[in-house]
């Protein structure tokens, strides 16, 4: 049995299944963490962070089950999930929602709350270059939505990038070159990343699975 009260939804996107967990942190009890083999390392965390972490790992467990693996990801020295061989995976959180996806290749998933016009104006220069803004405006999407997608896509692209290359990376290393009604193209170190996205009125989700 899975701990903490939650509701699972399977979201198909680009041939993958994202496991979405909507959870109620008010139902979280510290003993719920005993479900995780490494629970002792989480005891110093605040309750909210513990609940979010647990929700992400519940999503990860469902995602691994989807591919026939009953293990849970271990935890790395940066608190990152360590996926069982031969799988790659990714986890993301936003409010009372957590997502996870597992794939046979490097993969990144990200969920973000949609920017308001005011927030988009404040954050624009820290997320995109003038050249990228041209690509966003060409998409025909409302600018706050396009900027949220750009931010989320760079997060997903970063997560899909091999860990050895991640350390010195920032947003400027990923360039948005195109956004369509369902995809987004990024350039990173002369590689083209093709991402897929979906949006609701409140949130966006981006998925980056690298070509093998």
Tell me the role of every PLM-derived stretch:
Residues 1-212:
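Core catalytic alpha/beta fold that binds nucleotide/phospho-ligands
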């Amino acid at each position: 049995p899975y701990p903490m009260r939650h509701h699972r939804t399977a979201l198909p996107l680009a041939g993958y299944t994202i496991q979405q967990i909507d959870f109620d942190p008010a139902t979280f009890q510290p003993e719920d963490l005993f479900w995780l083999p490494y629970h002792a390392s989480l005891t110093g965390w605040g309750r909210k962070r513990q609940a979010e972490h647990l929700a992400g790992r519940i999503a990860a467990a469902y995602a691994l089950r989807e591919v026939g693996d009953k293990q849970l990801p271990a935890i790395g020295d940066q608190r990152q999930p360590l996926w069982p061989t031969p799988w790659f995976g990714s986890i993301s959180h936003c409010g009372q929602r957590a997502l996870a996806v597992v794939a046979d290749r490097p993969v990144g998933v990200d969920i973000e709350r949609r920017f308001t016009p005011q927030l988009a104006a404040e954050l624009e220069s820290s997320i995109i270059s003038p050249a990228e803004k041209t690509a966003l405006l060409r998409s025909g999407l409302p600018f706050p939505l396009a900027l949220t997608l750009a931010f989320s896509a760079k997060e997903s692209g970063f997560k899909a990038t091999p860990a050895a290359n991640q350390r010195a990376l920032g947003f400027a290393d990923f360039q948005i070159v195109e956004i369509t009604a369902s995809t987004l193209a990024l350039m990173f170190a002369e590689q083209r990343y093709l991402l897929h996205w979906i949006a609701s009125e409140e949130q966006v989700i981006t998925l980056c699975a690298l070509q093998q």
